[in-house]
């Protein structure tokens, strides 16, 4: 089963507005998705750029998004320091930050993939986990996934 991931900020395959990039406010865009399959216990989100010169660059990692959530607001006010057990956990991006870091390609047009996963469990990872740790922990627990891709150039 697939999830339909959308944004009010940009259309799949189109340009991401500068507001969400390093040359703008560098805030996260609003995201929304449809109902997950039965049994979903949480969601995870990975945002990355496969066109980065040194290999895929990770811009945002979120996990343990509560199962009842169907959207993330623009400029989501979360950091990696979670004390609420019901809070969304933020992983570490390629800049070493536990936050959203928007598109900032050195040159040319890059593609930015927002990948959402519906999981049959909540994950035992701590805030600050990497994309690689998250992917390993999600193995065997993905019920559905969806993708939204936007482009950006400076």
What are the language-model segments listed below?
Residues 1-154:
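N-terminus-centered regions that define maturation/targeting leaders and the start
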